[in-house]
């Protein structure tokens, strides 16, 4: 998952070929017992054999932190805390043209559609997700890469679309799931959207908040059929998930029946609240408050160049 998520992060840039991507791996472990040593070895083996070799990408650089354990004495007791085995992947590549990079922000164009590309094989696994942590559920099944060939086909198809300027915006699904991905693009673009989910989804919360592999792309309606066909021809699941609206609101519908409505400004402030509280303590409190007050305001231009 770490490797594929890193690749999805830079897939919006004109890279053309997967082997052009190189990875940096940061390995972290306490590495003080046979169990952790075995798990670390199996992780490295799986990354190389099951993922990198099949994708044709390399890991030329990286670092390791293999002493992730703290021990101390307290009330005549020996106490220790250690990090679980953790791998952080960063991806990098040269690109053909910076102007072809597709941004993670929706364009305010009503003649467009937002398409969800699902790379999970229809799974809603929520183990380790923000949803499971907030609700304190004991979901043991975590997202994983089910079909590496499908992932390769997705990369190739998406690079073709970028090369031919057929995608207006792009954002990968990650922390917070599909709903957060859609909201972040709306916040960045300052546009409201109508999100339409199917009524036959068995668990709407898991569908919205699972953190499986996937992306959303915004496409001109003139090219919508062509874009969807390219993905479908590569056996990649895709469907229209949202449309731009002119109300500056986020509306969630279940096949046209509205189940949730909120102003974009209110949701943007909620999304930014944690960062704001930290910023108040860390930086100038008055400046932090001034910034927070204009978050999501439709009339705020933000940083711009007056030509």
Where are these regions (language model features)?
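A glycine-rich phosphate/pyrophosphate-binding beta-strand-loop-alpha-helix module
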Residues: 1-70
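Intein/HINT protein-splicing elements and their conserved insertion hotspots or analogous self-processing inserts
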Residues: 15, 41-43, 58, 64-209, ...
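Short hydrophobic/aromatic beta-strand micro-patches
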Residues: 216-220
């Amino acid at each position: 998952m770490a490797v594929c998520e890193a690749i999805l992060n830079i897939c919006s840039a004109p890279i053309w070929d997967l082997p052009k991507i190189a990875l940096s791996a940061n390995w972290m472990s306490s590495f003080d017992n046979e169990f952790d040593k075995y798990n670390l070895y199996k992780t490295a083996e799986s990354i190389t054999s099951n993922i990198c070799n099949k994708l044709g990408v390399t890991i030329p650089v990286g670092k390791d932190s293999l002493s992730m354990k703290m021990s101390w004495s307290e009330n005549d007791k020996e106490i220790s805390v250690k990090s679980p085995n953790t791998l952080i992947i960063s991806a990098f590549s040269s690109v053909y043209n910076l102007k072809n990079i597709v941004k993670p922000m929706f364009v305010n164009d009503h003649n467009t559609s937002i398409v969800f590309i699902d790379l999970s094989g229809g799974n809603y696994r929520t183990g380790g997700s923000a949803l499971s942590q907030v609700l304190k559920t004991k979901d043991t099944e975590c997202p994983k890469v089910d079909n590496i060939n499908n992932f390769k086909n997705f990369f190739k198809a998406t690079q073709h679309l970028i090369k031919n300027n057929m995608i207006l915006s792009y954002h990968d699904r990650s922390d917070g799931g599909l709903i957060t991905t859609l909201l972040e693009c709306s916040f960045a673009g300052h546009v409201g959207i109508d999100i339409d989910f199917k009524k036959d989804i068995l668990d709407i919360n898991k569908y919205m908040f699972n953190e499986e592999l996937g992306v959303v792309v915004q496409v001109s309606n003139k090219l919508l059929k062509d874009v969807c066909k390219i993905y479908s021809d590569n056996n990649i699941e895709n469907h229209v998930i949202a449309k731009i609206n002119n109300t500056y609101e986020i509306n969630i519908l279940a096949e046209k029946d509205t189940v949730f409505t909120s102003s974009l400004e209110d949701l943007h402030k909620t999304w930014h609240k944690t960062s704001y509280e930290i910023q108040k303590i860390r930086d100038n409190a008055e400046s932090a408050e001034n910034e927070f007050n204009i978050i999501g305001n439709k009339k705020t231009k933000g940083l711009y160049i007056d030509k």
